[in-house]
């Protein structure tokens, strides 16, 4: 009897909420179309671990701009290039903030001390200028070319050695190691590689786990009274990740402070300043317009380490998956490589401009598998977008994943065809945010500041794998599974395990 009463009360509540919701929608200013929400959870029940796919399905039913309540948080989702342009360009001043009030952001940024999630204001503007002029600018990238070359050679040697011994390569692990070593050397002139293989594996796992947890929907972020309960266990996991990173960062920072105090010979041995040196210079500069504290420095390092490592690694992994599943594309890329570079030396960054088909492969990978499937913004004030009223403090999701698969802009959108970027003048179609049907790195003020670095790393390391090796896939049909899993950077659900077969001998040049 008690169960029946409870059931009747629940149904009555849902019916009442539905009537109230419809009545309120009629009386309010025009919001975008929306499914009917449930009490307390809103539309959370409609989302799976891959929300970009769920948003896409909802947009097919309700339109290019939809309104949702994720718990008590009002959200809008833009799923077409035209809608994205309205939010990211026409109304960019109103959508220049990123939502920072999440457990993951608060925990991994030392209490909102970072750059990537800082509100649009003096601190963010200062750090963005610093990134583009020094930390991730052209001069810094040119300066660290020898670092990227050295890590690429180490990468080739590791893969080659496994091929000689008949051992399979786990692309995910190798790409994480490669990207992490490049980024670590740019930040602190060190790699995560030590004699302790367990420590190396732990660092790789920390980066992957941080990226994965940051992209998962934590119900505590959307239903406020559940925050203290940590129902999914995310809070404890995030704190553990942050504490592990913190131990490493404290050790590195303490060592660097001691070097700078004592003018240690180690400082002189470095050919040029790394990112940590630049950040310390600013923190010690009394005339600097912004004073950086230790938490700002650590939070910035974590921003770059996590974002810079995982995005490049995931992109290279998806690219290899597509090449293995499309052997005709792989062969065409090899032919281009042989014609332009030859077989007597390894491809270099300076060759990339002369390899349009390789560039097409990378762009096609970013179209189908953008490292960030959703762009996150938050409205700082009320805005009217495409005739819809968007209140302040509304969270915006731009579904880059769906936009890249829109048949209105892409012929046969689910087909992996790099030719679409090298035919009919499409080679000028860039990925830096000027073309709103291709937004893998975002657009406008909040576009990814590390785009140039990511493209350099992805192009040249994908190129050496194409040039130097053939691949034997450990499965019956020679294909790899293309399922996605949860994460802020679109990770693969299944690892790619292949045995490398040497195609040309890189030893004379490495």
Curated annotation (Swiss-Prot):
Induction field: By fungal elicitor.
Transmembrane segments: 64-84
Gene Ontology cellular component list: membrane
Cofactor needs: heme
A GO MF term: oxidoreductase activity, acting on paired donors, with incorporation or reduction of molecular oxygen, NAD(P)H as one donor, and incorporation of one atom of oxygen
Domain of life: Eukaryota
Gene3D superfamilies per UniProt: Cytochrome P450
Stored PROSITE patterns: CYTOCHROME_P450
Known EC number: 1.14.-.-
Membrane topology: Single-pass membrane protein
Residues binding heme: 448
Subcellular location field: Membrane
Pfam (any one): p450
Family the entry assigns: Belongs to the cytochrome P450 family.
The protein, known as: Cytochrome P450 93A3
Origin species: Glycine max
Gene behind this protein: CYP93A3
